[in-house]
Amino acid sequence: MKCTSIFFSLLVIATFVVAQPNYDFTKLKREHLGRGVIAIRENPSTVVVSWRYLSSDPMDESFDIYRDGKKVNKHPLKNATFFQDSYQGTEPALYTVKAIKGKTESNYQLPADAPTGYLNIPLVRPEGGTTPSGQAYTYAPNDASIGDVDGDGEYEIILKWDPSNAHDNAHDGYTGPVIFDCYKLNGQQLWRINMGRNVRAGAHYTQFMVFDLDGDGRAEVVMKTGDGTVDGTGKVIGDANADYRNERGRILTGPEYLTIFNGLTGEAMQTIDYVPERGNLMDWGDGRANRSDRYLACIAYLDGVHPSVVMCRGYYTRTVLAAYDWDGKNLKNRWVFDSNNPGCRAYAGQGNHNLRVGDVDGDGCDEIVYGQCCLLYTSPRPR
């Protein structure tokens, strides 16, 4: 009992001394988003109105809701971004959310007889194909991300199409190319990027980051590419004729690139050599790219002000993370952490299938929690 009491006391003390995030939001470079008002018919007599609380809003901000110019809430709505309006009408209705202190407003047009509680966005499915082994494949929507690529304050969707023959790293086999589309919420397709034959399809291979990295109000797209990747304007990256796939459909040789794309047009703005590079396959734990081709990525405020993109490779044995900044013209490497470096060997094999970003020590700068290890924002110094 005594040991239990001491342990509980230490646990309570530890709970209270844990550092809290301490971001300076007056300096943090953020997205320039609108209010994001949406109105959804919940049932025949109720419409749900929801909106975005902006990081620039005062902490005590409150809101008024209007339907076709008529105020529908009795009192200002505080500490809330959700409202249920009693409305049985079947005709179109214009909902407006007004911030009382911020003096801003945003609108949403509820369609007549709105039949669904979601936006129906039509997709343009890519045509399938056939691999060198004669296997036919088709395409299905896979992962997606969001970002305001045109600066209108509204998110667009960046959608990854995976071929039906996508493989886990542990499996042999050819795959069709990975394809990315960008759609506006009204269904307009802005561009299509084809990753080409030298980027294998599978859950671990292509980690795509979507964020406004240079603060111009428009999100960029960053991901690993290869010879034959075709950007959103039709331009080919590297050697269009190169084919590094072996007889098992694996890619064990050939150059690897990191490309930053214009989020609005899909144009490749800069392509550099990918770090961490493949190097000696056995350093990662095997010789068939099962472990060397395990990728992760994230966006982190490493200096507490500007967003950086961090590209990661490996977690079963060797682990490498490389941080980059984009100033609108150049991708600049901020740092590289490599568990193969002297003094860092204990950090090999500590990762898993995901990572987390956050200010874990309360200094206002993001750290990266990589499985069982934590990397300081000024890496290559580990925590």
Regions found by a protein language model. Name each.
Residues 22-53:
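Pro/Thr/Ser/Gly-rich low-complexity, intrinsically disordered linker/stalk tracts
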Residues 53, 57-91:
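Recognizes extended acidic, P/S/T-rich segments that occur
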Residues 72-75, 107-145, 153-163, 169-170, ...:
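Aromatic (tryptophan-biased) beta-strands that constitute blades/sheets of beta-rich domains
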Residues 90-101:
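Beta-strand-rich modules
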Residues 142-149, 206-214, 296-302, 353-360:
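Beta-propeller blade termini
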Residues 151-161, 215-224, 304-312, 364-369:
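Acidic/hydrophobic-patterned starts of short beta strands in beta-sheet-rich repeat architectures
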Residues 160-176, 224-252:
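Short, conserved, GDST-rich strand-edge loop motifs in beta-rich repeat architectures
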Residues 377-383:
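Conserved small/polar residues in nucleotide/adenosyl-binding loops
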